[in-house]
Amino acid sequence: AIPVVLHGFNSPDHLWRGLQWMSAMGSAAALVAALRAMPPERSRATRAVLVGVLLAALVPIAWHGVLQVWQQHPAMVEEFLQHRPEILAARGWPEGSPQALTYERRLMQPEATAWFGLSNVASSAFAAGALAFAGAAIALRRVRPASAFLLALVAAVSGLLVIVNGSKGALLALLAGTVFAVWCAWRAPSARTCVRIATTFVVLVLVAVLVRGWIGERWSERSLLFRSHYVTAATQIVIEHPWFGVGPAGFGESYLVARPDRSPEEVQSAHAAWADWLASMGVCGTAWIVLFGALVALAAHGAAAAPSPGARGVSGDAVTASVPPRIGSFAWSRGPIIAAVVVLAASLVAIVPEFDSLDDATLLMRVLAALFAASIAGATVRAVLIGGRAWAAGIAGAVLLLAMHGQVEMTLWWPGSVGRTVALIAVGAAFAMPRSTCDRWSPVMATFAACALLVPATIGVIGAQRAHAAEAVVARAAQPLAAFGLARLHIAPAPNTSLASARMQAALLLLEHSTNPWLDRPAVVAVGLQQLASAVSVVPPEDANWPAKAIELANHALDTHHYESVAASAALVAEALDAANVRGMKGVTKAAIDSLLQRAAQCQVSINPRSVRGWARLANVAEAQGDSAASSSAALRALAADDSFALDPLRKLPAFERANLQRQASDK
């Protein structure tokens, strides 16, 4: 975690992502150590409550996914089709451009992303929930058949959402986890055999990625091929930054330079936990790899653990149907209530940030989903307390599929999922860690792990203060623009000011401010420049000083931010000014506009040598200046970069743009 802290001092992007990684891995170690340090009965009860909370939290997520697929997605597509030109223009994407085609392709796919934002990451959670809830339903089926039915229903819905999302990796991981769970429950293998099988499954995923890279384009499959590209680039990044890596948020920019020549994608993650950790933290990332591997192995070990003892007089075969010996114990009577209250409170608190945007019907459904999640939490706790082979195999299979999918997807990289995923894996591992009577080190380790969590907590509190101040500025910048959106939806009257004025106000708030690293993040600066480009595209401008101010702000952004997103957005400002200049705009010279465009494009290609748009801009500027040799050279680079995207045809240039580049390349 040392590299995370070091990189965090340099950039808030490294800080907020890295702190979540640190918290997730530190909490995993603390959970396992603390559960091992507890007396057996208390540890068992605590595990049950933790599992109940972690799994039941999936219910509101699954509910949201169902709404997205069958209600929100059709409405979103209809809205896009009705306002397609305006939406594309607001993003600066010409009709038929690679960006527009890629955006439309993703928009038309019905996906249950819930609050994760990524369908493949959400599919990891749904798949794990499907398998774990199925094991819990089997464990509870004879004691509480009604509760078992509800658990089975949630398992079925979760599995259906995985199918709807169409995530091949999640489906294969779910299949592997199910096979492993069924085999463990049916054959009752030894613990060593379970660990070997689980390890083999995870290693096979890594081997599949490497073999797919070796096969190359001789096979039409693309998903694993792209994963092999990510791993190849990650290896190059580790070689160049072996000690402390490039930081939790540094992979994206590094990938632009290190990616293979035929890789058409620009990604922020290696889509493999081990590669992400090594690229982000260098050799220090091996500590997390070892910890994660140990947790997965322990969870597999737990699949072979002896089932919980049944009630007196109940045979071992019926253990899943029996009530624990202390049916009136605190764990059995109070554990479900504790888990239900925690889940209910968390689900209701999660509504607060969205409260103002929810109508009455949606709000009622959110509350009902929270109540249903609370009931699922209580049922899950009782299933875990009953235990048995089915439950032990189910949770071990869920951990295995998470570990497998984490080697080909961003499940263990994405901040919204890493904490939940690692916590479930840690609790699954804790089932295989009974405490011996002479164990004196577990309490010490638990205390040390808990104290270590104070480091990310302290840094997080300090960073949250500046983040809160930056959030207030962003909210002020967005407020005038939101008024126009509400007016378009006929929810509020149209504002008295113009849209261009609102965009300029937002740009000034985001680009001119006192020192705050959270407002100087590339994503915020890029958005500010995009709003600036839209504001100055209006002729005549509302303020004669706007064009000159736009040149100044764009150049300042290029001075302080060496990121492709910022360079591309600065180029949009120059192009907007150039188009406005043709229509008679006054205030800046053509030479100043061309200078900004050339500088932004040069910055763009220096960061991303395969930026088609950057090379095309350089070709256009050189042609306008009468430098045919430079124009031809840049056009040839643009055409070569465009050819390298053959694996993703939608990213290739439209025919008319490519024809223009070919003309420029031939003019020497």
Show which residues each predicted segment covers.
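TM-adjacent membrane-interface loops and short helices in multi-pass inner/ER membrane proteins
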Residues: 73-77, 118, 228-268, 274-288
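Intrinsically disordered, low-complexity Ser/Thr- and acidic-rich flexible linkers and loops
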Residues: 312, 356-359, 582-588
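Alpha-helical transmembrane segments of multi-pass inner-membrane proteins
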Residues: 1-8, 15-214, 273-310, 317-319, ...
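Hydrophobic alpha-helical transmembrane segments in integral membrane proteins
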Residues: 69-70, 211-225, 453-482
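Juxtamembrane loop-helix boundary motifs flanking transmembrane segments in multi-pass membrane proteins
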Residues: 104-108, 226, 230, 247, ...
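Flexible interhelical linker loops that connect adjacent transmembrane helices
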Residues: 433-445
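C-terminal luminal/periplasmic domains and tails of membrane-associated envelope-modifying transferases
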Residues: 475-668
